[in-house]
A protein has these predicted regions:
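GHKL (Bergerat-fold) ATPase N-terminal catalytic module, capturing the glycine-rich phosphate-binding loop
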Residues: 1-160
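Glycine/threonine-rich ATP-lid/beta-loop region of ATP-binding domains
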Residues: 153-226
């Protein structure tokens, strides 16, 4: 529980959100790839792409972001300086080279949804805010109360992006979803798995892959670990 009110401010002109949001990406898979790349850079081992009736949720078990340590503020600094030092090109673990996505990619979800929940947990500290194409109070973002910060598959650390009422949907065939993701993001292996989860998408038999096709029922036991 927070002992003080957190404030979230996006370092970009609010007018850009409305103009750039729906035009930044026109392909749902490029949007997903941005957040898969963020998960990779956060040393995540698992990314969950969850297709629900009213939203598309992306969760990862990476480091998460701390408000107190300034990591959330850094995330919201869309116009931040690009990495130039070699030591900054590696992830926190030192085992991966960062994907090097541009800061504007953080707004990718606004291409799909007018309202996006961002929730994160790091060292038992939860933070959450709502990105919107039409911010009500200038650069200030609406905070999400601790009691409303919910995760489906992650527990101690990680980040969740929830695109409410998305304008684009995943393909009806899960194999098609897998093929599209592999084209855009091929860096899957034993240490980095993508789980595609849906109640409604059709699951076809496929060979073993680190992009795992799952139904909601088949994943109920995964909350305790993989």
């Amino acid at each position: 529980m927070n002992i003080y009110m957190k404030e979230y401010q996006l370092n970009v002109d609010p007018r850009i959100l409305e103009l750039l949001g729906p035009n930044l990406y026109t392909n749902i898979y490029y949007v997903l790839a941005e957040f898969v790349a963020n998960a990779y850079d956060a040393d995540a081992h698992n990314v969950y792409i969850i297709s629900n009736k009213d939203d598309i949720r992306i969760e990862d078990d990476g480091h998460g972001m701390s408000y107190q340590n300034g990591e959330v503020k850094k995330f919201l600094n869309v116009a931040g300086v690009s990495r130039v030092k070699e030591e900054e090109s590696m992830t926190r673990s030192g085992e991966r080279r960062k994907m090097g996505r541009k800061g504007v990619g953080k707004l990718a979800a606004l291409s799909v949804s007018e309202s996006v929940d961002v929730m994160t947990i790091s060292d038992n500290e939860q933070s959450g805010f709502v990105l919107s194409r039409r911010p009500i109070d200038g650069n200030k973002l609406r905070p999400i109360a601790d009691d409303d910060i919910k995760f489906v598959y992650i527990q101690e650390h990680g980040t969740a992006i929830v695109m409410r009422n998305p304008q684009y949907r995943l393909n009806k065939s899960m194999d098609s979803v897998k093929r599209n993701l592999l084209k855009i993001f091929p860096l899957v292996n034993d240490n980095f798995k993508i789980h595609i989860i849906s109640i409604s998408l059709k699951i076809s038999p496929s060979k073993h892959s680190q992009i795992l096709l799952r139904s909601i029922d088949g994943l109920r036991s995964m909350k305790k670990g993989i």
